[in-house]
């Protein structure tokens, strides 16, 4: 029962498993293969043995890449029914139009579909059957591709995003899962592509089998190295965020501040800055080109560096990220209601506003924050219409918003995508400038930030 015990320990330890006032929904990603079939069985065994009040749902992604895909879906439905789990399926179209390989494209489509199904079913926790051999393969593949620390860190045991992803068997060898499946006489489907050497993982497996004779502990050793690299990556990220707090406090990046850093810290800060805007898949070559153009252009130059899905501009000593192909148009004139912020909850709150392509981040502030009483009025985001005025220093006069943007060095092409936050009819915050000081509380209040989203979140390997 070792594998069932691992499921029990790691699921219960997840904060996402605890649902206040209700029964948690735990989802299992079920491809129909041996590993995921064993995981579904083990989760159900834990549920039944412990009498845990949990709703179990099996999620199957139909890629349509194999002739037997419909039969696999039917097999997965039977597996779910056998253990009393709900069953949901999502059909996806795998596109390689963006220059990605079929494996990467299928993985991205699969994770996006799993996230969507979790949202539909109310699942707070998603389990996948990745194991120690998968982790070893991932580390070696990333090494052969010349990946950086993030790639070489491979797959984390848990990942916090829209739903918590947990890999409870990431330290379990494939052989243990095979033994579990045989011991319980489980049925599963065989994917013929697993023997196709055109796929990178399959091509690597015979080499790993040979390696095991000389290095029997290679799986655990590679996983241990990945853990060390993940810790190093976390340290670099911490340093980068400290640098960004100083050189990019309002979202735009001060080029002079970047130039004052060492080369490695420049690259780390740029990666973190781009990642904060959703741009995670930026190659080393593109990053170096961006660094060179930001730091090497003439003082009066205005370089524009194109990246996948976005572009970076430099203007008056500041670097800006904007979505590619969008010349500076905001959403429709009608205000967009901001209804998911609760000033009574003293915690960081993120409110995504799809119409504006970004999010508002509300953080409790001991000083210099917008008065919570003012924020109790209906909140809305709106575009500039002309004639707005704002107070930017305590006790100071109001000034024209257009003039304030000009003095702040915000270029005209960027202003149209900077929303204004209103509490009722009162302007309380202007993206790119900050709060209206007449709305700032003497004591505690709320710090507001605007986070433009110009790309999509990255996906974990696997």
From Swiss-Prot:
Transmembrane segments: none annotated. Its EC number is 6.3.4.19. It catalyses: cytidine(34) in tRNA(Ile2) + L-lysine + ATP = lysidine(34) in tRNA(Ile2) + AMP + diphosphate + H(+). GO terms for biological process: tRNA modification. Pfam families: ATP_bind_3, TilS, TilS_C. SUPFAM superfamilies: Adenine nucleotide alpha hydrolases-like, MesJ substrate recognition domain-like, PheT/TilS domain. One of its GO terms (cellular component) is cytoplasm. It is found in: Cytoplasm. InterPro entries: Lysidine-tRNA-synth_C, Rossmann-like_a/b/a_fold, TilS/TtcA_N, tRNA_Ile_lys_synt, tRNA_Ile_lys_synt_N, tRNA_Ile_lys_synt_subst-bd. The keyword ATP-binding applies. Belongs to the tRNA(Ile)-lysidine synthase family. This is tRNA(Ile)-lysidine synthase. It comes from Ralstonia nicotianae (strain ATCC BAA-1114 / GMI1000). The gene is tilS.
């Amino acid at each position: 029962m070792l594998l069932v015990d691992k499921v029990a320990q790691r699921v219960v330890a997840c904060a996402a498993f605890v649902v206040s006032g209700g029964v948690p929904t735990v989802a299992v990603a079920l491809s129909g293969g041996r590993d995921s079939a064993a995981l579904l069985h083990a989760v159900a065994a834990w549920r039944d043995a412990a009498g845990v009040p949990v709703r179990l749902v099996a999620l199957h992604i139909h890629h349509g890449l194999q002739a037997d895909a419909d039969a696999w879906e039917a097999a997965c439905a039977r597996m779910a029914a056998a253990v009393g789990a709900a069953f949901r399926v999502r059909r996806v179209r795998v596109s390689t139009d963006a220059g990605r390989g079929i494996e990467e494209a299928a993985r991205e489509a699969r994770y996006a579909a799993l996230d969507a199904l979790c949202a539909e079913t109310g699942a707070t926790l998603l389990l996948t059957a990745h194991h120690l051999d998968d982790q070893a393969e991932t580390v070696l593949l990333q090494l052969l591709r010349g990946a950086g620390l993030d790639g070489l860190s491979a797959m984390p045991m848990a990942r916090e995003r829209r739903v918590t992803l947990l890999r409870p068997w990431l330290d379990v060898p494939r052989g243990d899962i095979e033994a579990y499946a045989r011991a319980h006489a489980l049925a599963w489907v065989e994917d013929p592509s697993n023997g196709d050497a055109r796929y990178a993982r399959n091509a690597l497996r015979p080499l790993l089998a040979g390696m095991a004779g000389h290095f029997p502990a290679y799986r655990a050793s590679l996983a241990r190295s990945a853990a060390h690299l993940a810790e190093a990556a976390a340290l670099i990220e911490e340093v980068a965020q400290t640098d960004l707090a100083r050189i990019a406090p309002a979202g735009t990046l001060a080029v002079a501040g970047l130039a004052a850093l060492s080369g490695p810290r420049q690259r780390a800060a740029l990666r973190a800055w781009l990642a904060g805007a959703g741009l995670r898949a930026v190659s080393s070559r593109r990053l170096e080109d961006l660094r060179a153009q930001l730091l090497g252009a003439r003082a009066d130059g205005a370089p524009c560096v194109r990246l996948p899905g976005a572009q970076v501009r430099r203007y008056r000593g500041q670097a800006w990220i904007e979505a590619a192909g969008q010349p500076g148009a905001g959403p429709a004139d009608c205000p967009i209601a901001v209804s998911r912020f609760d000033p009574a909850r003293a915690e960081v709150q993120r409110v995504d506003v799809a119409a504006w392509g970004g999010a508002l981040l509300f953080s409790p502030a001991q000083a210099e924050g917008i008065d919570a009483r003012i924020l109790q009025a209906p909140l809305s985001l709106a575009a500039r219409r002309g004639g707005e005025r704002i107070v930017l220093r305590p006790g100071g006069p109001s000034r024209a918003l257009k003039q304030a943007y000009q003095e702040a060095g915000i270029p005209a092409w960027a202003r149209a995508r900077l929303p204004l936050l209103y509490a009722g009819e009162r302007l309380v915050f202007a993206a790119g400038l900050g709060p209206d000081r007449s709305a700032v509380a003497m004591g505690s209040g709320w710090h507001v930030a605007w986070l433009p989203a110009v790309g999509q979140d990255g996906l974990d390997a696997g």
